[in-house]
Amino acid sequence: MEQILKFLWYISTIILVFSILIHNPKSEGLGTIGSQNQFFSNTRSTENTLNKVTWLFLALFLLFTTILAIN
Amino acid sequence: MSQKSDLRNRIKFTLLLLVLARLGIFIPVPGIDHDAFYASVEKNTLVNFLNIFSGGGFSTIGIFALGIVPYINSSIVMQLLTKIIPDLEKLQKEEGELGRQKITQITRYLALGWATLQSGAISIWVKPYVFNWNFTFVCESVLALTAGSMIIMWLSELITEKGIGNGASLLIFQNIVSGLPKNFTQSFFDANYSNTSIKFGLFIVIFLLMIIITIFVQEGTRRIKIISARQLGKSSILDPNSYLPLKLNQGGVMPIVFASASMALPAYLTQLTQNTFLLQVLYLFCPNGSLYLVLYSVLILFFSYFYTSIVMNPEDIATNLKKMGASIPNIRPGQATIDYLQVILNRLTFLGATFLFTVALIPFIIEKVAQIQNLRGLGATSLLILVGVAIDTAKQIQTYVISKKYDSMTK
């Protein structure tokens, strides 16, 4: 059981990091603070799907980590 | 009506993400004896310093222990690199939106690398407190901490994009605020201190004073009168309403955030080296060292100038003025205007940075005079960030409301 959980944890974590990295944020990070364009963002549909996937794996990651920590 | 609820949704979204970011600090990385670790690092200056940015997550080694730090550090590195490497500068200046997105993307990869390195260092560092220390443990904690840091980065981007305010600075804000109660109790309710109430009163007064000074510094602008072709015919008197605002502190909080993040570097390095000479040199720059303040002031100055050069480019302003058919009275358009603006910007930035540093210095002096301990972690760094972020966010909300009003007007 523990092994399976560990395995799932690894998978979800790696996918999570990967899915966060392939995001292409409109916001320009810390670099150019105060740029006026941030309110004119139009989210593309791929970005939407990606967001959902990321949220899913984020939840899984948190869940698995918590369970592993309790054990 | 709809714009109001839209704003409300943005604020709700932001708060939700902040709560989530806070929650992750308390989910521990598996396999570590957290109680023993916590007890041993409580008095460690480095850990306390790092806790400022991660909201206490560092001493509990939660999965969000690294927090936003890797992202900030890689932003600093990238900002510096864009000035050094011509290709990157070209990306930032000439390729417009797409180029900047590319730079953001590189920054994120760099953040991943940084997070991996840092979490690797942590997983080796906590070795004495681990139940079963082996290669698997290192792999797992590196993975967990790196993922945590990436999540925080993503959350900060989400806040910037879909919430309100700047995500990264809001997260730092929240972490500092969450450390405040602990800081207060440590400073004032320790059994060793006498005259607690007087000191507390003094502290409150100074605290308020610092906030006021900080607000003045952050809000101060130099207004350069401009005159446009349209006005010329109407009257010979300058319209007092048309001016070019140049802020005293162009970079806002960013110089302070960057400077204080860089200040953690010497403290880090002391953990890595065993060489006594190197250690002695490095300790000079640690929070209790004699050169700490000097380095801090130099960094604030450096990042202020650096930021001003990024945010405000005199050449661009001059070109824009020309396009608008406006000019500064008594200054020729073109090169003369550029030079004039550059001189003013340089002076403003120097003044602004000096002010910032003076405010940062106050807690140190107070500490010496009133012998209050532990004020440092709160004072110098945090207060400036707190005030700056609060002002920034309030402004962004205002801007948002106004821009929504314009939108509904044109519809």
From Swiss-Prot, chain A:
Transmembrane portions of the chain: 4-24, 50-70
The entry's keywords: Chloroplast, Membrane, Plastid, Protein transport, Thylakoid, Translocation, Transmembrane, Transmembrane helix, Transport
Topology relative to the membrane: Multi-pass membrane protein
InterPro entries referenced in this protein's UniProt entry, alphabetically: SecG
GO biological process, one term: protein secretion
Subcellular location(s) of the protein: Plastid, Chloroplast thylakoid membrane
Keyword Transmembrane among UniProt keywords: yes
Principal subcellular localization: plastid
UniProt KW Kinase keyword: no
Example of a GO MF term: protein-transporting ATPase activity
Top-level lineage group: Eukaryota
GO CC annotations, alphabetized: chloroplast thylakoid membrane
Function: Involved in protein export. Participates in an early event of protein translocation across the chloroplast thylakoid membrane (Potential).
Family per similarity comment: Belongs to the SecG family.
Name recorded for this polypeptide: Probable protein-export membrane protein secG
Record organism: Porphyra purpurea
From Swiss-Prot, chain B:
Assigned GO CC terms: chloroplast thylakoid membrane
InterPro entries, per the entry: SecY, SecY/SEC61-alpha, SecY_CS, SecY_dom_sf
Residue spans crossing the bilayer: 13-33, 52-72, 111-131, 135-155, 163-180, 197-217, 252-272, 291-311, 350-370, 377-397
Subcellular location field: Plastid, Chloroplast thylakoid membrane
Biological process annotations from GO: intracellular protein transmembrane transport; protein targeting
Superkingdom in the source lineage: Eukaryota
Membrane association type: Multi-pass membrane protein
Keywords for the protein's UniProt record, in alphabetical order: Chloroplast, Membrane, Plastid, Protein transport, Thylakoid, Translocation, Transmembrane, Transmembrane helix, Transport
Main location: plastid
Pfam families: SecY (PF00344)
Subunit structure: Component of the plastid Sec protein translocase complex, which is composed of at least SecY, SecE and SecG.
Family: Belongs to the SecY/SEC61-alpha family.
Function description: The central subunit of the protein translocation channel SecYE. Consists of two halves formed by TMs 1-5 and 6-10. These two domains form a lateral gate at the front which open onto the bilayer between TMs 2 and 7, and are clamped together by SecE at the back. The channel is closed by both a pore ring composed of hydrophobic SecY resides and a short helix (helix 2A) on the extracellular side of the membrane which forms a plug.
Protein name (Swiss-Prot/TrEMBL): Protein translocase subunit SecY
Organism: Porphyra purpurea
